[in-house]
């Protein structure tokens, strides 16, 4: 093809680019090693480590792209789809639990004998090939495989459920997204009953959450995925000074006083952390979620669990802090405004009550690949990640105003503090 013919000049230029990329990887690796060591010391920041790791990963990807060249890089996009499909098949078969987590190798026939489902040997061999070509499994002999640290997580119940949930729910929606827009117009989806997800899954008028609930196994995977997700970025809860803000109010409290309402708080990991951050202040953190979620919550001292649908009237009024973590990115603006208005109606202007939203706050440029990927996944069912300006505009529609944005250097996770406008 014109412009892509290998000439001495082109080869020399490519070699120079590769050497430059190698240098950048070395620099990023050294920085990561240094920051990771400092993070282990008292006062160290995991946010700094996350930022440095993201920079290292970015530079490694750039190096890989330089070495591969455009054709190989494009081919690898298709290879990634094939590998995901193979991994999903192996996860369903139970293969990752059939290969020793210790790293001890297992031959194909051994793996087959440990599976609880009937699997054709030739099929298993072909699926294992692609997962061992460059990971996550490793091929240690003819038709013999062993686990790696990467593949080992696929045997963890919550993590494999998360993987299944993402592949089963988002996979078809991402793949058919172009066709959805071709048929429905090139505009941002805002109707949860007419979006890439509903198009791909043929939900017949149901939005995603209602559709998933029709399938017990998929609902189970979804619940476990939400549980696993509750740990992701949980450190960012500490960005907001809960105790300081509550003490500023000068309000007398006792053991039964609601200090914070954690709305849509899931399994309660965040609620427990907030209560710890408010150590020394009498009162409780109210954990709210749907009844089926609350039913599985383990008791935690200082945390009161309550069944609640955040689209309905907020029953706990006049609390110092209302807290939303990774909720609004699941919803388009119209639905998000409804959620916010329910909270605003319960807030005390004189106190004043505060709303704290822990979410990604996207930069206006230079977004990370991870944040962009999450935003694409959210788009499949009308959700979205938002910039500072978009958060301000969203809050204004609900009669609220942002008064402060809390951020950690090098990470998109932050906290938006808002009061009644």
Label each region the model flagged:
Residues 2-60, 64-69:
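Eukaryotic partner-binding/assembly regions in large regulatory complexes
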Residues 2-5, 22-33, 39, 104-106, ...:
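Conserved adenosyl
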Residues 64-93:
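Short alpha-helical segments that sit at the start of domains
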Residues 102-115:
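Short acidic, hydrophobic short linear motifs in intrinsically disordered regions
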Residues 117-133:
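Short amphipathic alpha-helical interaction segments
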Residues 132-144:
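A short, conserved structural fragment
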Residues 366-382:
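Short, glycine-/aromatic-enriched active-site segment of Class I SAM-dependent methyltransferases
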Residues 383-399:
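Short alpha-helix
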């Amino acid at each position: 093809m014109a412009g892509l013919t290998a000439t001495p000049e082109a080869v020399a230029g490519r070699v120079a680019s590769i050497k430059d990329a190698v240098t950048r990887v070395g620099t990023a690796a050294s920085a990561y090693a240094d920051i990771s060591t400092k993070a282990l010391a008292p006062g160290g920041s995991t946010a700094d480590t996350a930022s440095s790791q993201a920079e290292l990963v970015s530079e490694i990807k750039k190096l890989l792209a330089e070495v591969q060249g455009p054709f190989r890089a494009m081919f690898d996009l298709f290879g990634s789809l094939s590998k995901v499909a193979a991994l999903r098949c192996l996860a369903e078969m139970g293969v990752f639990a059939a290969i020793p987590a210790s790293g001890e190798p297992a031959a194909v026939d051994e793996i087959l004998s440990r599976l609880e489902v009937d699997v054709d040997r030739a099929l298993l061999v072909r699926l294992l090939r692609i997962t061992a070509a460059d990971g996550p499994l490793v091929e240690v002999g003819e038709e013999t495989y062993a686990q790696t640290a990467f593949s080992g997580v696929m045997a963890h119940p919550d993590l494999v459920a998360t993987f299944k949930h993402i592949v089963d729910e988002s996979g078809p929606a991402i793949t058919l997204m172009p066709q959805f827009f071709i048929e429905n117009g090139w505009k941002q989806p805002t109707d949860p009953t007419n979006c890439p997800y509903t198009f791909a899954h043929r939900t017949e008028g149901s939005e995603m959450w209602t559709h998933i609930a029709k399938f017990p196994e998929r609902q189970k995977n979804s619940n476990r995925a939400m549980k696993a997700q509750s740990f992701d970025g949980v450190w960012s809860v500490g960005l907001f000074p809960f105790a300081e803000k509550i003490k500023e109010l000068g309000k007398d409290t006792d053991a039964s006083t609601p200090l914070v309402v954690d709305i849509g708080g899931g399994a309660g990991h965040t609620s427990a952390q907030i209560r710890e951050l408010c150590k020394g202040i009498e009162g409780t953190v109210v954990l709210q979620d749907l009844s089926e979620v609350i039913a599985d919550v383990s008791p935690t001292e200082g945390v009161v669990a309550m069944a609640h649908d955040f689209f309905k009237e907020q029953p706990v009024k006049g609390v110092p802090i209302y807290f939303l973590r990774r909720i609004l990115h699941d919803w388009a603006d119209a639905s998000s405004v409804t959620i916010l208005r329910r909270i605003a109606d319960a807030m005390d202007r004189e106190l004043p009550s505060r709303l704290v939203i822990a979410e990604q706050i996207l930069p206006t440029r230079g977004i990370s690949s991870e944040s962009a990927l999450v935003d694409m996944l959210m788009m499949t069912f009308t959700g979205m990640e938002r910039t500072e300006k978009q958060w301000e505009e969203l809050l204004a529609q609900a009669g609220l105003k942002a008064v402060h944005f809390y951020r950690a250097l090098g990470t998109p996770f932050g906290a938006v503090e808002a009061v009644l406008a």
